[in-house]
Amino acid sequence: MKANELREKSVEQLNEQLLELLRDQFNLRMQKATGQLGQSHLLSQVKRDIARVKTVLNQQAGK
């Protein structure tokens, strides 16, 4: 996911995307805790995506 793609979305779409990413992060953390997570890079990838969405939301709120 790129920041340019996120800037084209509305605030409602970004909030939905953020909720989905937070759910994904929670599920990945639970899988890691139980030893079921085989692809550990997904955790950091989702964390970065959450940061991107929050950054774009803050930029749009400042306009």
From Swiss-Prot:
Q: Which InterPro entries match?
A: Ribosomal_protein_uL29 (IPR050063), Ribosomal_uL29 (IPR001854), Ribosomal_uL29_CS (IPR018254), Ribosomal_uL29_sf (IPR036049)
Q: Which PROSITE patterns match?
A: RIBOSOMAL_L29 (PS00579)
PANTHER family in UniProt: 60S RIBOSOMAL PROTEIN L35/50S RIBOSOMAL PROTEIN L29, LARGE RIBOSOMAL SUBUNIT PROTEIN UL29C
Instruction: Report the source organism.
Output: Stutzerimonas stutzeri (strain A1501)
Instruction: Cite a single GO MF annotation.
Output: structural constituent of ribosome
Give one Pfam family.
Ribosomal_L29
UniProtKB keywords = Ribonucleoprotein, Ribosomal protein
Q: Which GO terms describe its biological process?
A: translation
| The protein's name in its UniProt record | Large ribosomal subunit protein uL29
Q: What is the lineage of its organism?
A: Bacteria, Pseudomonadati, Pseudomonadota, Gammaproteobacteria, Pseudomonadales
GO CC terms on record?
cytosolic large ribosomal subunit
What's the family? Belongs to the universal ribosomal protein uL29 family.
